[in-house]
Amino acid sequence: MDIDRVFSDMTVLEKAQLLCGASSFSLREFKELGIPRLNFLDGGTGINFEQLFPDRYQDLLDEYTPEEADHVITRFYKQDLLTDKEKELRERIADRLSKIKGNITAAPGCYPPGILLGATWNPDTVYKTGLALGMEALCYRVGVLLGTPNVNVLREPRCGRLFEGYSEDPKLNSVLAPEICRGVEETGVASNTKHFVCNNLEINRVGIDETVSMRALREIYFPGFKACSKVTRTFMSAYPSINGTSSSESRFLLTEVLRDDWGFEGTVVTDWGACTGKTSDAINAGCQIYMPGPWDHTEIMEAIQNGSLSTEKLDEAAYSVLKLIDERASLEMPSDLTNDRYIETGDRAAYEAAKEGICLLMNKEDALPIKQGSKVSIFGDNRGELQDFGGGSAQVFTDRTTSMPETLKTYLGSGNISYNDIDAFYEGAYAVVTETILSREGQDREDLNMTRETRDILGSLGKARSMGAKGRIILILNIPGPVTLDGAEDIIDGLICVFYPGMMGGLALADILTGRVNPSGALPVTFPARYEDTPAFLSYPDSFKCTYGEGIFVGYRGYQIRKIKPLFCFGYGLSYTSFDIRDIKASVNNGRVDIKACIANTGDMGGKAVIQVYSHKLSSMVRRPESELRTFAKVYIEAGCEQQVDLSFDVTDLMYYSEDHGKFLLEDGKYELRAGLSSEDIARTCVIDIGECSPELRFGPDTSCLEISRAPLVLEALKQDLEDAGQSFQPFITCLRYTPQDKIAVHFPECRSYKRFMDACAKHRRD
């Protein structure tokens, strides 16, 4: 398409219509102009039939009852559960699907969500997941794959969509989330980074007004989005208002930050129904696409007529959308993509992600792995079958699933696997208990407790243990985010967290249980001992107002500053082997901090370790977290071997955001670098010295009276200069008593010309 020619032929009305969704998940087709339809779809875990079928095949669904249509959507690959009439609808839809999928007859894949990808700490694994997601989207003619990724910080563990995000830490977010973008974009499909910004709750999500400090936005909530802005084609605005302004109508977010500060040149689409004000206000703010359709263009035309929206601004938005359509609306499947390759590519990516992200959290007396010939009894009504995905936009209906119990039967023998067999447990069989918690978009969890069923099972097994049962208890956490164990940690022997592991989760879990795979996942989020310990506990809203009262102290930052011990800390994950960080050295070169670390595998099994380096500012002039993740690496080390690991990060990463100055500032002085296998397991430290600070922080006229009072030589020099100038020292005494944070220049504007004072300040900085 010659977009410049097409654009010049478009009327103002057509440009307005171009911005407005035509259906729930597509933009309007203009046949006479040669503009094709652009399809959107969720998402980050695979193809969502609940969105796809009504958007593409509503004419078929209308011939059946809503219940029949819903059954076909959710049971498309469970035909034995369908009535004859529902099977008829299924066949009609399958026929339509075959016309776009060609020789791809397999079901869509279900991939792990962000929280499990975050637990991999492996950028390459996340990238390969993005490639598989992009391949799937091509097969369904999806031009923009929504939620690739969801970068919202894991702030509130009860959030119904917590599982979609990657981490509570901005650095881990910033390294991993862009890799989904890269993978999807490499296939030609447009990735979509959402929800910008602070979509951290489901309660009152449409219309809630969140008060968030600028420092918290800049240091915690923006970095993941900023990293994605360099590689993603589209952004999605969020539901909440931030500091009084709707995210979809915020010029600060969508223009000043996203475009002016970060240089984003792509297209912004609203979250579905997020634009609750005037469409023209959102266009002026920097938003281009309005969903879902059919979206009314009338208000845009009225704004053009009354002058509240300029034709130039409309042109800017329409051209951005037209360019996106030209690039992504007419994508074709690769000609060499066979059904077998489609399955193999997806299965491999999903398996690697699950294998890399599943976390071993407890392993008392080496209870795991389960040895060949052992007996296993699986307890619970779900019979060990995993929930692969969360509810809402992230749900995927497929028959490409794997089963942990069935795989264990293959590995250990069918005769060694039983269900709910307490007698076998008495005789020494492993008791495997799966705790599954369902979570979904639209509502938050009520608490962080395990289900009553699981607590009762563990209670019964614990009682049997006290009465002489010889078996070991393994608890599997099939969860959307943190849970509290309420004392179960004293009963169980092994604990594995699989989150929602995707379609290959059953296989990956069985491989880890039996030692075919050495677990290497590390938690991307802190697990509290009690919900009341969480940093955001007191800020959970009961209205349409929410204050992020914890500020920058999100996740492990909040636990450390309050000296609260969590159940499992950020970055924590065990292995079937053991590792020792034996040395760390660091130097500052050309604006980079270069680190060399030596890590050894001191066990008898090859495995992967996640080495993490945190920084701690020694003697800071502002309140800062106790430690902040700066860099990390996941490395494989053979048993009995050691490996040199090179890591680095920018000196600018050490900056903090000053609300007084409206910018990031760098403190000079000493920073301790802490290397460990989690945020709490610090093995080695070293110190670097940053020799130059930001001009705004140089000791001198802009320093507070309080800080000056703590520098005796500087204070004496000031007194002498004031005496020579015939000025009183009394203003300093008064300031120190009542407003000690005032800058010295506020009370002595001429101090910049005081030679003794300025020389003493320079010497103080050097010393």
Predicted feature residues:
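Terminal connector regions
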Residues: 651-693
